[in-house]
Amino acid sequence: MRKLLFVILLICFHTSLYAQTNNVLLSRVLRQVQLYPQEKTYVFTDAESYQAGQRIHLRVFLVNAVVHQVDSISRYVYVELLNPERLVVKRVRLLRSDQGFVGHIDIPEGVVKGRYVLRSYTKNMLNLSRYESLKSIFIGGHGRLTPSKYSNSLNREETNNSINLLVNVLKKGIKVSIDKLSNSSEDDYRLFVHCRSIPLYFGKISKEKDVILSYDSLSQGGIYSFQLLDTKLNKVAERLKFVYPEKELCPISVRWTDGEKLNNNQIPCVIKADSLREGETMDVSVRVEYAGVDNTVGQSDIISHLLFDMDKADCPEEPSSVCLESEPDSLLDNCNWSRYRMSDVIKGECKKGLIGVEKSAMIRGRVETLIGHKPIKDGVVNLISPDKSFYVVTKTDAQGRFSFEGIDFPEGTQYVLNAFTKAGKSWVKLLLDEDEYPSYKGQLPPFVWTSNDTTRVDATLKLPKGGIQMEEVNVFSHQPTYSSRSDAYSRTADFSFGLRDIESIGATCLHELLRRVPSVTVEFGKCYVRGGFTVGGRRPAAIAIDGIFVNEDYDLDNIQMADVERVDVFKGGSTVIWGAIGGMGVISVTTKKGDFKAASVPLTNTKTFTTLGYQIPQAYTPNARTPMWLPSLRGASFRLLFPAEYRSTYRLIIEGVTSEGRIVHYTGEIGR
């Protein structure tokens, strides 16, 4: 927001309106932006084309939609791989880290060749249905995007056809005039000009009086919205123009220092931006790719995506050529800028997004009675993650609802939920809210398939002299779990039998094993812990199989010892992690994976599930097509080392933003 406040202060000196009205307008715009901050995403990948079974390495730039600074508010970004039928092939969830949002998507084996798209979004971005962020990739070949005027009639705003708003872009400014037809009775109009909601002009305009905006007074670049308003500030007409993108760019230079060639045949390369302001730094991603595979013509880039695609409704992706040619004017005809309804904002009608910003992961659900399905108030809900040594408890509200916040665990983490009444009874029904992800229903960017490609892209780099190319070898290993204290349950247990203990004892049944535990007795097939008495008499210990409680009359002989990996006994204070049902002690049996069918023990108060956790970044493996991939570089300049052979056949691509929101983009063959 630093850049936004700075720009607004500058605009105060260039807005041709009385100071009092000007201050009101600026305060309303600023209030809307603060009340409903919007975001944009851009996906930078390690290549433009892939093969089935290959891994897509990516970084998502999440920026403020107004000033393009990376200090955005969402904690998570979702990335989906969509096939040509708009169906989700893979979905990952990225957590903000020191490197930004860095992750990968594995392309399944056997997928058909064609154009696929990477869709990226935050929960906050779902408030805008007509603004999507797509990145085209090609599997099994190469292709290029073609410019398109996407057609979508949703939410089109009607304007007065009796007034023509004419916008003429000049070298040193912009001339705005109106052509009013004879049947129009209105004579008093206002012209409102903004770029990404940043107001640039607000003043009177008439058929006899044109408005001239000088180049130096315009601080922004990208899509400008020229709105003609009547005396009640209702929008009469609107025109969009793509102008002065150079105002948003931060040019960089790449210089080779041949005189510093190192002994290992590597040459230093210095990347810097001479136009950086005081305190301004770059946050960029870098890749080096083989120049003979993908032609950069017909590909999108960060400039066209942030300045054009994400500011035009129903425009998911255009090639980078839209920023360089005369195409934007035809593509913007009859379009409206609708990230904010600016005609309402200048009236003081500011709105907030319906979907809140996702700042932490949450698990939600509901607890109700088995009969009548009535909500249970003050019910106890336990959340346990055996894999991550995690345990937390909460209570339900008057509607039987519960929620756990701050559940930040990686993908694949398994959870167990147990619900009970306030009195500790398990005769309840536990309902878990399923995660919902929006389907993509918009248009796919048009493209032209240029060539097929079956070349192995996971081949190694150029072999050194005397090297031997080996076939791919996969090595798998399995280490048996002999530890008796390997997860959250066993570490707090009073007594444990691990796999090694069970094998050394040679027990033939669980009863034989439990008789070795002090203060535990086995009578008539039930286990009792000494001291386990209630006002209703003596009660047996609870039995949990793989974290799920079974009925009190469950026969432990149903479990074969060959299927058991560990047995843990909880007595006294250690039973607190199991909730009220574990008050008489708990016998926890962990089976070998896949050998025990827990589904044969249906429990309405227990759920075992896995959520879409965040993805852990993986190291990049260089290949012949992309020998270098650096997802995150921050600073005012960078010094990289490249092998000398890169200078003849490889291309360097750098994209990112600066701390002040200026866009960084560089593409060029190394050494030229």
Label each region the model flagged.
Residues 584-587:
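Glycine-centered small-residue motifs that form tight turns
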Residues 526-571, 597-602:
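Periplasmic plug
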Residues 55, 87-88, 199, 235, ...:
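Short, solvent-exposed loop/turn motifs
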Residues 20-39, 44, 50-51, 55-94, ...:
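Contiguous segments within soluble domain cores/interaction surfaces
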Residues 32-36, 47-51, 72, 108-113, ...:
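Surface-exposed, low-complexity/disordered segments
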Residues 1-27:
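Bacterial Sec-dependent N-terminal signal peptides
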Residues 101-107:
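Ligand-binding face of N-terminal immunoglobulin V-set domains in extracellular IgSF glycoproteins
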Residues 44, 390, 553-555:
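Short, solvent-exposed loop/turn positions at domain surfaces
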